[in-house]
């Protein structure tokens, strides 16, 4: 039950939560990015640097994820691929994507992309706040506990 992290866009506070959880729960956590990453020394924390390019890290994660794995990503298409592969996807704000919710999220993402391509200013997500970090940590802990019980 490893954890994969779409690390290029993952906020630093979320990575720090993941580092502590990987060490505490002794779960292999692999951060995939198209740039070098500094991570704390740990046998449970690994990095995988991929070529620069659009969605390269996403494709690498999607190819390696197995049923039961957890992927940390805010990328909706990657989350959909993960769910289709039998994995679980959690975004940095603590929302778990499910088969029931991912299609609606994909539809909204595509709609917003169409608006942006038509020149409509849609804004971006709000900055990560303390409640988001707490929600993420709680969702991660629930996943880790479920994994230990199975």
UniProtKB/Swiss-Prot annotation:
Pfam family, one: DUF188
Family membership: Belongs to the UPF0178 family.
InterPro entries: UPF0178
Domain of life: Bacteria
Signal peptide region: none
Protein name: UPF0178 protein AHA_0543
């Amino acid at each position: 039950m490893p954890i994969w992290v779409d690390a290029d866009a993952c906020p630093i506070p979320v990575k720090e939560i993941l580092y502590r959880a990987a060490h505490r729960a002794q779960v292999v956590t692999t951060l995939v990015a198209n740039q070098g990453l500094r991570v704390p020394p740990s046998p449970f924390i690994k990095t995988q640097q991929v070529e620069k390019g659009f969605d390269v890290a996403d494709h690498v994660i999607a190819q390696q994820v197995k049923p039961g794995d957890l992927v940390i990503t805010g990328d909706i298409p990657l989350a959909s691929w993960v769910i289709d592969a039998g994995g679980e996807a959690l975004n940095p704000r603590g929302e778990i994507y499910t088969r029931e919710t991912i299609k609606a999220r994909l539809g909204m993402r595509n709609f917003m992309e169409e608006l942006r391509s038509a020149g409509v200013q849609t804004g971006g997500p709000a900055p990560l706040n303390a409640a988001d970090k707490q929600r993420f940590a709680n969702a991660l802990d629930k996943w880790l506990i479920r994994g230990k019980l199975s």
